[in-house]
Amino acid sequence: MRRPWRVAVVGGGIAGLAAAVRLRDSAPAGTEITVYEQSGVLGGKLRTGELAGQPVEFGAESFLMRDPTGAESAAVALARRLGLAEKIVHPTVGQAALVIDGGLRPIPGGTLVGVPGDLERVATVARPAADADTDGGRPLVGPDADISVGELVRSRFGDEVVERLVDPMLGGVYAGRADDLSLVTTMPALARTARVEHTLVGAVRAAQAAAPRAPGAPVFGTLAGGLSTLVEAAVTASGATIRRDAAVRELTATDTGWRLTVGPTRDPELVDVDAVVLAVPARPAARLLSGPAPAVAAGVGALDYASVALVTMALPQPRLPELSGFLVPSTEGLLIKAATFFTTKWGHLGRPDGLALVRASVGRYGEEAHLQRPDADLAATVHRELSAVLGTPLPAPVDGHVQRWGGALPQYAPGHADRLGAARTALRAAHPTLVLAGAGFDGVGIPVCVRSGETAAEEIITALGGSAR
């Protein structure tokens, strides 16, 4: 292929933008990259807004500094590539709490997403089942099996550990329940060790040992000035043509690549390209795949999503505990499932006037009806519940914002990784220049999405480099 490549990236979230940057870095000079975003805003779930005159995250708040192997995460590497490494800041308060019986108790250490590696350390919040985690003479999970996190943990530690520890931890990330979420997709490190170890305590410890972290090394980071700076820098570095408010409605295979149908039904724009990175959620991806790859579309489109709302308040001089925030088990009967004390957790957000920024997350999978309330009602309920948990009336907010994220968080059922692997294998065989990327396929979190986009870009480069066209 001698002429400049033309590559379309459908979806302007961080996965799509990471793909565009990698294409610019690694594809031949002159490659034409166009990013199509159906909304008017780039960055997907990365969105920095302003509250009481201060930048605040209305979407994703931070990223992991390390990947599961202990190496630098893809988010950190991207920030470094974009010249933002010096802007990375870390939490100044790391201790979080759980709401247990209406009060706050510190989250015990030594767990892996709430799954304990030391049963004595979690006794302050949950009572593990006595003598259930015994060596049965074989690995916990079969070599090719995938089960729910809840099934594994309940069988070894009992209900209370799941309901008070694991469920709220997973709920804070996925807005889902441990009994419904895939072990392989949501906790891959534990899944690997569970295929070798005979006890769950042993599997947790082995997973922790496989990704050692230096004492005191930060787990999370964010960018001073907000995560939208990552989005803006990626757009600039990609050198891509950015098409906002440009919905791609159809993909059609051609003799030389792909034809995109873009824009309104009555007057569509037809665009011919050599390759496509499809970096949109599973259901929109399935709609676009329904023509060229209907069997793949059927598998991809089965993924369900949870909706959430983030309620952020600016509170004048509230009495807050010295915590980064707290998680709420569903058994507590509260609307909120998590809260973050932004100005306590992140020292760079602290204000001399004592104004505090507090954000609460609302919404669990299957409970979308709770999100039908008007913004004012949602904010009032959050304010009331925060006051009750903290044991003191909070002052009235001087500013606030409700950000609703409909269908935001994928619910990876057991077997997701195998289903996705089969779909990708079929798609690669039939259409190597059409590649999937994003949270709906590879997992949530900024590093995973960045890596997903970069991997998709590399697949496109390989496919076009080997093309005879």
Show the residue positions of the predicted features:
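Mid-domain catalytic core of redox enzymes
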Residues: 246-359, 363-372, 376, 388-389
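Glycine-rich FAD pyrophosphate-binding loop
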Residues: 24-51
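Dinucleotide-binding Rossmann-like beta1-alpha1 core, especially the glycine-rich loop
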Residues: 52-140
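Active-site/ligand-binding neighborhood in enzyme catalytic cores
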Residues: 134-251, 257
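Conserved Rossmann-like nucleotide-cofactor binding loop
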Residues: 15, 41, 283
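Conserved flavin/dinucleotide-binding core of flavoenzymes
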Residues: 2, 48-49, 107-116, 323, ...
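Beta1/beta-strand and adjacent pyrophosphate-binding region of the FAD-binding site
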Residues: 2-15
